[in-house]
């Protein structure tokens, strides 16, 4: 008990000059926790001793761990443009400025300006998406997983949905197509084999209980070698003949203006829409906007989705709608430079090399400019890469990777060397990167 009295008052810890740079609420929160934990340890072992400096060190470590876990701006030097762990697509500052007036004010989110009555939150965005994709109707939910669930639950609940075994995919976070189908209330009917599915497999599987054929884009892996699948066009011809629904879960879809290294054999959303009744894809992947599930297709099916009570749970907020709408308008105005994902994907080698040389000339550290390859990321185009330039450092790669990470720079290890890939590094981050490099090398 006497040892407990030796603990300094909480106010003494909170007001210590060593913690002065931290927010008061964090000092108070962690001081109480650390003192409480130390007292518990002391009650178990009376030989322990905690000095003022011991307590301050523990509080500092706890606050630092807490702050490092908070959202923070990073420099993406991995070369992976749509980096799932680093926030996928980013929003251009000009797009952000356009949305500020809507986000920071009251708006006509669900208010019809002509009638003065309640309106639909989807109207403004839907109007622009329909022009961009030349589709009958559209709907937006909070992500593509929600889109898949809503479509299956609305259009095929308690009915059979046919899909190829080669498309029973798993994406990040253990999101598996078969389990989603089960949760949505549909009966999965698998056809074909892992490496081969033929048109006759679909034809034989269709019966009076069949409601839909689901085709899923294998966006995060690729089959090579002895492999065969049925095209979306062939499936759509069959579904029209059999009067059932064709749904394409695209996952990550590109709209316009994509690098020639990537576009080969990769159909656009517009092209795919010609060969299915309904499709869905992510807003924050190749489309280059914020997280959302964008659903396009026949009006009669979209209208059914809008009547499902689940939509209330899956709907997007005004901030998401504003960002998506401004991105869509940027596409319509052909302002591709205002969509960072597109810009980074389409940057030519001279632009990338120029960024790398700018850094190399500004730092007094030995490094080598090398040609390399970047990836798209975001579970998109796994078998394709883009030419790039990197700065390669000779020091211990893993140690250097950790040092840069602590400075907010995320690079990669390649052939035993730590490298910074300049395809994914933003122009606005170059000076910040110079400062980080100098700090890492104490230059």
Swiss-Prot record:
Q: Pathway of this protein?
A: Aminoacyl-tRNA biosynthesis; selenocysteinyl-tRNA(Sec) biosynthesis; selenocysteinyl-tRNA(Sec) from L-seryl-tRNA(Sec) (bacterial route): step 1/1
| InterPro entries in the record | PyrdxlP-dep_Trfase, PyrdxlP-dep_Trfase_major, SelA-like, SelA_trans
* Gene this protein is translated from: selA
Query: E.C. number, please?
Result: 2.9.1.1
Q: What is its main location?
A: cytoplasm
Q: What is this protein called?
A: L-seryl-tRNA(Sec) selenium transferase
The protein's matches in PANTHER family, at most eight in alphabetical order, are given as:
L-SERYL-TRNA(SEC) SELENIUM TRANSFERASE
Q: Which cofactor does it need?
A: pyridoxal 5'-phosphate
Q: Give the function comment from the record.
A: Converts seryl-tRNA(Sec) to selenocysteinyl-tRNA(Sec) required for selenoprotein biosynthesis.
Q: Which GO terms describe its cellular component?
A: cytoplasm
Q: Which reactions are catalysed by this chain?
A: L-seryl-tRNA(Sec) + selenophosphate + H(+) = L-selenocysteinyl-tRNA(Sec) + phosphate
Keywords attached to this entry: Cytoplasm, Protein biosynthesis, Pyridoxal phosphate, Selenium, Transferase
> Which residues are annotated as modified residue N6-(pyridoxal phosphate)lysine in the UniProt record?
285
Q: What class of enzyme is it?
A: transferase
